[in-house]
Swiss-Prot record:
GO terms for biological process: translation. Keywords: Ribonucleoprotein, Ribosomal protein, RNA-binding, rRNA-binding, tRNA-binding. Binds 23S rRNA and is also seen to make contacts with the A and possibly P site tRNAs. HAMAP family: Ribosomal_uL16. InterPro entries: Ribosomal_uL16 (IPR047873), Ribosomal_uL16_bact-type (IPR000114), Ribosomal_uL16_CS (IPR020798), Ribosomal_uL16_dom (IPR016180), Ribosomal_uL16_sf (IPR036920). It comes from Stenotrophomonas maltophilia (strain K279a). This is Large ribosomal subunit protein uL16. One of its GO terms (molecular function) is structural constituent of ribosome. Part of the 50S ribosomal subunit. One of its GO terms (cellular component) is cytosolic large ribosomal subunit.
Amino acid sequence: MLQPKRTKYRKVHKGRNDGLSWSANAVSFGEYGLKATAHGQLTARQIEAARRSISRYVKRGGKMWIRVFPDKPITKKPIEVRMGSGKGNVEYWVAQIQPGRMIYEIEGVSEEVAREAFRLAAAKLSVTTTFVTRTVR
């Protein structure tokens, strides 16, 4: 699963996830892309599950790029622990997603195959997405 090798700080503030994606909002590497249309967080498990579903559907054809990386730690306190006593331990990692963010890209397959692969992948993700094609080469 994806997670940073090392970070400057173990835990981060909750923060706010608002605004639009200013970077990574166009198909840059492949021919087709899966673009987020809503705010949300993608866990490392969700990213991996969607990657597997795309890989299984296209089999050996095509090349895929993952355009998001889970670099934010999410903490959780153990069950039946009283409030206070500091912040909990890191439970999992997430990538914060804004509308317009490209999540996956693919090339080397037909549009029908790419559409179906991304449809299967979108079912594994917690944000709404749309299928986009590259406009200019």
